Amino acid sequence: MTKSVHTTNAGNALIRVADDCPASSGQIPRERSGKPTVATLQYAMIKNHPYKYTSDDVVFATSAAGRALGVEAEPAERQKAREQFFSRGQACLRASALGKTFGWGVHSDAQGRVAIFAVDSPEYRRFAADPGIKQVKAMRSKRG
């Protein structure tokens, strides 16, 4: 019996900023109590390496399971932890505070690798107006 593996990856898509996002431009997420938040980790990983990582790479690396491994983890150990992590469905980048709170849209290229763009940037507007790119909204912070 083969284990089901879930994915958060999407190709050629834009996660648009949530309708109730308070930011009118891209804001850099800040640490909380001197410690990085998931949003600060996601921001640094994607902003510093645009189109290098997939959504799955970012979601796993910034999860508690991914952070617990550390850099010294063997590739086989990392792969096993990743398979276990994705054996259940995981929240995709639509649920990230980047698009819900901080004003960043997430674009994925045809290979599913991601980059972020400020909501007020020309690149974001270009992607948002492109009918060839699948458009999805970041999840709202509040119901209703």
Show the residue positions of the predicted features.
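A recognition module on extended beta-rich or small alphabeta surfaces enriched in W/G with H and D/E
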Residues: 129-144
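Amphipathic protein-protein interaction modules
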Residues: 59-124
